[in-house]
Amino acid sequence: MKWFAAFALALLALLQPAVAQTGKPRIALVSIHVAEMPTIARAGARRVEGAVSVDFYGLGGGLVPSIEGIDLGRYNLVLLDAPGPRALNFSTQLEAAKARTKVLVVGAGTPIAGNIDPQAHPDVARYWNNATEENYAGLFAYTARLLGHPVAVPAPVEFPSLALWHPEAKGPFSAIDDYLAWERARFNDGASRPLIGILFYRSLVLADNAGVVAALIREVERQGGLPVPIWREGSRDRASKLLGDRRIDALILCANRLDYADAAAGVAEAERLGVPPLMCATDYRRDVEAWRKSLGGFAPDATGELALSELEGIVEPMVVGARAVATDGTAAYAPIAGQVRWRVARAMAWARLHRLPNSEKRIVIPYHNEEPGEADIGSDPDSYLDAQGSIVALLHRLRAEGYDTGTDPIPGRAQLARRLAEAGSNVRPGDDATLRRRIGQGAIAVPLRTYLDWYAELPKALRDTVEARWGPPPGRIMAVDGKIVVPVLRFGKVVLAAHPLWGPQADAGALAEKGALPPH
């Protein structure tokens, strides 16, 4: 029977998760988040490599291998962070691993359960939700001790879910008044500077990966604003709670949504903040050079998120950063300097507008008129919207809120529709008489010399592309007697302006172009 005992022991060894020859437990961390930015998790693993061996995997994509084809059962323990449906593609593989080894779910929203109860190990969530290099090391040490190995385990270091952070400060501020006192003291005019909120995720700071946020903060200061940088752990953490009765003048939102779970709650938060959220984004897939070479700016897979962001009133989406991967495999997010300047300049303009009395604000309301003439005016025919009626309602609302809409009675829907058709519609190329009549009816007439001064500010490469397709300025669209004409109706400081004509109106051959058409 000795042979049977030996065989049983050998079989048992094969069925048990493998242990390295050094006796160290082997752990697999499967995480879609760490896969994208594994730098600090790897650094944490190096801190405890004498006590535990950690391998990193994702679900495809990112900077670590996929678990596809990997025998996870050979590890002593698998840490799983895989929110969303992608994990279901590997459900058979993960269930097979659970039959042979321990699986502990660490990421919220993971659709596959483990075989270790997370509630029995509350420190695991504390390590994971406060993901610094130190806490990753603590997590890996904790799992080694969970497996029965005598490893020293540091307590998790926790951070507030809402705080104010500045790269020059020693640590985060939990109170807005303390932060403002510190920040204002750094500038002679600190008390009068507009307050520019910057809302971002805490994980960037904890991962030592807040270069884009730091660039925004410093650019706000350079342009004469006072940054109010707020980190949040998740999208349910409300910046308005931290601000209290303080009011910011503009908000730069480093995310696609104010509340990913509830758009209505996001709208309510925007209303509490009292300013429109100005979106900025980091391209997580491409580096700066690849982003510069792209025609679209945003990656195609961002289209859905951009559309959803509009549900919360988030406007002006801009890319301000991209991924940078070093030769040693470390990764970070790098700011795109020109984009950062532009994002902040727009925020500063919004701040000036926010401080301006309504009666002094000047507003342009564009309306659809892509085809020349009266028939295609107001809104796109496919949308079935009553643009004229909506504009009338908007003019009444503006007047009620103190905007300068002139002294004349606001026209009714039919009267406005008639005025738009008679004086506010675009004109087909070559109809110079009607263009001159538009100027007499109050249209804006931009002298060519003035336009050329503006045009010269654009990059030469862009100007060359534009002129190769449409010819030199002013072109054939809405131009007469050395002037570019924009039909408008004026109501005090509120201007209704026709949408520019579609480029192929001047050159039907443009429709046969391959690729993107340049602006006209």
Task: Outline where the language-model segments fall.
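Bacterial N-terminal signal peptides
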Residues: 5-14
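An N-terminal assembly and electron-transfer interface module characteristic of large anaerobic redox
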Residues: 20-520
